[in-house]
Amino acid sequence: MTYLPSPRDVPIHKLFLVVILTALALTASSLGHTQARKDREFRECPDCPVMVGIPAGTFLMGSPKNEQGRFDSEGPQRVVSIKAFALGKYDITTAQFIDFLKSTGHRPMPCNRILGFAWGSPGRGLELQLPNWPAVCLEWIDAEAYVAWLNAKVHKERPALAPGPGPYRLPSEAEWEYAARAGTKTARWWGEAIGRNRANCNGCGSPWDDRLFATVESFAPNPFGLYGMLGNAWQWTEDCWHPNYIHAPDDGRAWTEKNCAKHVIRGGSWNSLPVLVRSASRSISTSDGGDYDNSSLTGFRVARDLP
């Protein structure tokens, strides 16, 4: 892992040169994958998320018509090009999100008013979750607020960064699937079948099956070195919801419209059936809360632009 004890002294283009070069080397050789993954990791400040450099490439997005459990929203399949970027090694954790709440005073909306699930709820707030669980009970706007705070934090520690938005953001839906597949073409990065103890879902054969969240390091990482891309907690993407991929961009950017109220979530959660725990599976959640919605099972991880 690349740690930066003095961020102000490291030019940003040099910081990511090693990330990009080692990512390219990873695609050219099957030797030393574990070390190559570690070489692509970086963290821009002591309490910033650990990021993993993802190599540029093309992939077939969506599911084939014969994939077991396929939904029409996962097609038509198409070739998508992805620029090199970085993605969080883990979901943002409860501890990381609490740091954000304490720093900003941000108050997420309740995600289940019937059961009283909310951040800051006396006696039963989400702050009581384990610190290394994925932070959940979050709407898309909460994830965006965290990203804005993280960008302000990094800009403060790195004044040489170009002015303007970024570099952190939510991943596009295409980036998310590309990273989840990690070069594989099967329904899940480990194969077609759900197997046993590969992820946390309702039928994944793990100790947490349909019971509760697992910690973010509970299962093996995928070939890109990313943990928990499938199962445990849904993850927000930048994209607005569309019922299929007709007219979708093929350059990896997010497919958005101004003020859309519905956004795409990916990956499945601890109570999802295996059919939803596939690389191509996608679902929908609103940005305006409600008595009960998917946000009670939804968190996020951050992406980062690379020069």
What are these regions (language model features)?
Residues 294-307:
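Short, structured beta-strand segments at or near domain termini in extracellular proteins/domains
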Residues 1-13:
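N-terminal secretory signal peptides that target proteins for export/translocation
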Residues 43-116, 136-142, 231:
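A short glycine-rich, aromatic-capped structural motif
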Residues 37-43:
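N-terminal pre-domain segments of enzymes
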Residues 60, 64-69, 117-286, 291:
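Functional-site microenvironments in short loops/helix caps that host divalent-cation chemistry
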